[in-house]
């Protein structure tokens, strides 16, 4: 069992609370792992009620996407050191990771102009190997509570997908070699399907939409390979809008 708290609560949660629970003699299962996060500062200042410089999550989700905020706080959160939250940095991360990299990869694959269905074709063996390795690497990081590194591995897979797409040039094969076009789109779609598994803890609202569009079952922590034709006559809606 994991117990998560801020670093200012370490003495209470590691000594006083366990002592109180033991004194009750109710055979409670005490935490196996203590997780203490660092502080989130805002614009280089500690959050202070007297200064009124705090921003609540409820206020943030009124203006910004909840999955985007969840992703930012896990991928760039105060894991081992205090972080300085600024709106500029948050917006840059949102637009870079979620719009330019992830969103663009999905859009150019699933919303390819003229694409009516994704057919089971030949999966790129090297990409398949990379996906399998990512599950192992990410799992180890999560078990060690190194969430930032886990997220970095996911972004790396997205970048691998984008690079593969660019190198394969499906916009040319669509006109000249439909078999190779199908292989490329099929491989990229399988990357997206597995990303929906890996990103489930971070952006569950968006991964659910991906699985629904691709007619996939619930997320599971193992490599999946699409084995049936998927009609994509209706465009996949944009997952993340660019913040200006």
List PLM regions with ranges.
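Basic, alpha-helical terminal appendages of large translation-related enzymes
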Residues: 83, 155-244
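Short active-site loop/helix that positions an aromatic residue
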Residues: 14-24
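Residue-level signal for inorganic ion chemistry
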Residues: 13, 102, 154, 204
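Conserved, charged catalytic cores of large soluble enzymes
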Residues: 106-138, 158, 162-177
């Amino acid at each position: 069992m994991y117990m998560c708290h801020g670093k200012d609560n370490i003495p209470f949660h590691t000594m006083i609370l366990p002592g109180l629970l033991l004194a009750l003699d109710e055979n409670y299962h005490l935490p196996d792992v203590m997780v203490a996060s660092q502080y989130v500062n805002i614009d280089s200042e500690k959050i202070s009620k007297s200064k009124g410089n705090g921003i609540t999550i409820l206020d943030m989700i009124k203006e910004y996407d909840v999955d985007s905020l969840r992703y930012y706080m896990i991928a760039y959160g105060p894991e081992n050191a205090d972080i300085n939250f600024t709106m500029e940095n948050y917006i840059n991360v949102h637009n870079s990771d979620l719009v330019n990299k992830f969103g663009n990869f999905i859009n150019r694959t699933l919303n390819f102009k003229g694409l009516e269905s994704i057919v089971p074709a030949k999966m790129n063996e090297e990409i398949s190997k990379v996906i399998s390795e990512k599950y192992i690497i990410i799992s180890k990081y999560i078990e060690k509570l190194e969430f930032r590194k886990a997220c970095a591995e996911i972004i790396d897979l997205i970048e691998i997908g984008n690079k593969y797409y660019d190198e394969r040039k499906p916009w040319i094969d669509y006109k000249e070699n439909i078999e190779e076009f199908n292989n490329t789109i099929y491989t990229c779609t399988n990357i997206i399907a597995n990303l929906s598994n890996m990103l489930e803890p971070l952006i569950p609202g968006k991964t659910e939409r991906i699985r629904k569009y691709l007619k996939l079952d619930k997320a599971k922590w193992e490599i999946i390979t699409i084995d049936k034709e998927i009609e994509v006559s209706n465009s996949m809606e944009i997952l993340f809008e660019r913040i200006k």
